Amino acid sequence: MTGSVDRPDQNRGERLMKSPGLDLVRRTLDEARAAARARGQDAGRGRVASVASGRVAGRRRSWSGPGPDIRDPQPLGKAARELAKKRGWSVRVAEGMVLGQWSAVVGHQIAEHARPTALNDGVLSVIAESTAWATQLRIMQAQLLAKIAAAVGNDVVRSLKITGPAAPSWRKGPRHIAGRGPRDTYG
């Protein structure tokens, strides 16, 4: 036991390096690299000679300078508008703005007494809190359309459908049987 002792880990590594399968892999890799170099492509270096950074030697980083630049951080709202514009969502965003920011679009006083319910095919449905406000909004319809167009753009809302509050129901309970028809109940 005084001679040299072979470690099993060391023998395994040496056997692996001499195996015919590994030689085949190395040869195939060398052939692929040579073919890539012949085509003028980057042959790759594997793990051995990896570059510490992605910079090309001899090129310095250029700073954007004191003026605005495309690489400067952009406000989130601007980036969202550009994304909506690129993807063709501008009309949908404008429609959502009419419904979501109604008070800012038409003004505080009108927003207190009327609320939008739907926007379908350029027709904005608005429910007023009273018949008097519904009549007033119908009279002001041209001015309302101008305010909306100024806030969100033309052709988003082409017309308004203004309704008053729903009429009272005389039904009692969850079930209903058809009555005898309309009657003069106030007379």
Swiss-Prot record:
Disordered, as annotated region: 1-23, 35-75, 168-187
UniProt biased composition (Basic and acidic residues): 1-17, 35-45
Protein origin, superkingdom: Bacteria
A Pfam family reported for this protein in Swiss-Prot or TrEMBL: DciA
HAMAP family, per the entry: UPF0232
NCBIfam families: PRK03195.1
Family: Belongs to the UPF0232 family.
Name of the protein in question: UPF0232 protein Mb0004
